[in-house]
From Swiss-Prot:
<keyword id="KW-0378">Hydrolase</keyword>
<feature type="binding site">
    <location>
        <position position="54"/>
    </location>
    <ligand>
        <name>substrate</name>
    </ligand>
</feature>
<feature type="binding site">
    <location>
        <position position="13"/>
    </location>
    <ligand>
        <name>Zn(2+)</name>
    </ligand>
</feature>
<dbReference type="Pfam" id="PF04952">
    <property type="entry name" value="AstE_AspA_hybrid"/>
</dbReference>
<dbReference type="Pfam" id="PF24827">
    <property type="entry name" value="AstE_AspA_cat"/>
</dbReference>
<dbReference type="InterPro" id="IPR016708">
    <property type="entry name" value="Aspartoacylase"/>
</dbReference>
<feature type="binding site">
    <location>
        <begin position="61"/>
        <end position="62"/>
    </location>
    <ligand>
        <name>substrate</name>
    </ligand>
</feature>
<dbReference type="InterPro" id="IPR055438">
    <property type="entry name" value="AstE_AspA_cat"/>
</dbReference>
<feature type="binding site">
    <location>
        <position position="273"/>
    </location>
    <ligand>
        <name>substrate</name>
    </ligand>
</feature>
<feature type="binding site">
    <location>
        <position position="105"/>
    </location>
    <ligand>
        <name>Zn(2+)</name>
    </ligand>
</feature>
<dbReference type="InterPro" id="IPR007036">
    <property type="entry name" value="Aste_AspA_hybrid_dom"/>
</dbReference>
<keyword id="KW-0862">Zinc</keyword>
<dbReference type="GO" id="GO:0008270">
    <property type="term" value="F:zinc ion binding"/>
</dbReference>
<dbReference type="GO" id="GO:0005829">
    <property type="term" value="C:cytosol"/>
</dbReference>
<dbReference type="InterPro" id="IPR050178">
    <property type="entry name" value="AspA/AstE_fam"/>
</dbReference>
<comment type="similarity">
    <text>Belongs to the AspA/AstE family. Aspartoacylase subfamily.</text>
</comment>
<dbReference type="GO" id="GO:0019807">
    <property type="term" value="F:aspartoacylase activity"/>
</dbReference>
């Protein structure tokens, strides 16, 4: 493995402040290098962080190349310019090229500590498998959703998102910060083991594959007219079958899941997703058997 530099990003969304605090503990000279690998720790969206908001003009994590934001607002939105800067500075062909990007996020949903992957890149599978094997973390595999594109880690040859919640926006939670610190330390250790061929992959990777998203009930004006059903609150990753309640509207009517397939919900009630008209996303569970090629692909970095 020839990885020489790894990018650790916090504050991609400016009001997700816990990973920024955790990263400060690592962004010191003694932590910059580990066994020949240089770690770059940056705040993804510093202006939004200063203002305590998610973004200035557009979601930075939807503003990299191949996104609608990038195509339509290349020269006018702060976030698209920031995305270009990050790629020019830290992209594989940048002035400080990084082979791997790790993007740290929090959520107001009860997701626990989880991994988010975008697509089925073998290098990403390799890194995610090691973390899942060590901590038992659930994996949300997001793919084939044309409404959501341009994610940060997709701009690097290898990368994943660490998502931790539930925690309110702009609220420091020591337990959440400790979880980020543990994950960052473990990632550094696992990458070091990979570099020295001291690792064995688990036999399989369990993923929850994105299938779609569900909006809140709405009235004729388009305003939200229902709440997440009490039985569904804080039940991320818990299976839903036909007939299970999803929402309770203003008339007291229960809106039930009417699909025939079993689904597993994620990001239930995520505050930031209201503007995207998403009350929750739903997934199907899939088991992917590990392949030696994953390690070979990772070693090629």
């Amino acid at each position: 493995m020839t990885v020489k530099r790894i990018l650790i990003v916090s504050g991609t969304h400016g009001n997700e402040i816990n990973p920024i605090w955790a990263v400060k503990q690592f962004n010191r000279e003694e932590n910059k290098f580990k066994n020949g690998i240089e770690y770059e720790y940056i705040i993804g969206n510093p202006i939004a962080y200063e203002k305590g908001c998610r973004y200035i003009d557009a979601d930075l994590n939807r503003s990299f190349k191949a996104s609608k934001n990038y195509d339509q607002h290349k020269n006018s939105f702060y976030e698209t310019n920031r995305a270009n800067f990050l790629v020019d500075e830290f992209g594989i062909d940048g002035s400080k090229p990084c082979q791997i990007a790790i993007d740290l996020h929090t959520t107001t949903a009860n997701m626990g500590t989880s991994i988010v992957l975008y697509g089925r890149r073998l290098k990403d599978f390799c890194l995610a498998a090691l973390l899942q094997n060590k901590f038992g973390l659930p994996i949300y595999l997001h793919e084939k959703d044309e409404a959501q594109t341009g994610f940060l880690v997709e701009a690097w040859p290898c990368g994943l998102v660490i998502e931790i919640g539930a925690v309110a926006q702009n609220f420091y939670d020591p337990k959440i910060i400790d979880r980020f610190s543990l994950i960052i330390s473990s990632l550094r250790e696992e990458i070091d083991k990979l570099k020295n061929n001291l690792i064995e992959l688990p036999k399989e990777l369990v993923v929850h594959v994105h299938q779609g998203s569900i909006d809140y009930p709405r009235d004729e004006k388009g305003d939200i007219d229902g709440l997440i059903h009490p039985e569904r609150i804080n039940q991320d990753w818990k299976m839903i079958k036909k007939g299970d309640p999803l929402f309770l509207d203003s008339q007291g009517i229960i809106h039930k899941y009417d699909g025939d397939q079993l689904i597993w919900p994620v990001f239930i009630g995520e505050v930031a997703y209201r503007e995207k008209k998403i009350a929750m996303s739903y997934t199907k569970k899939e088991v992917i058997f590990s392949k030696e090629k994953w390690v070979q692909e990772f070693a090629s970095l």
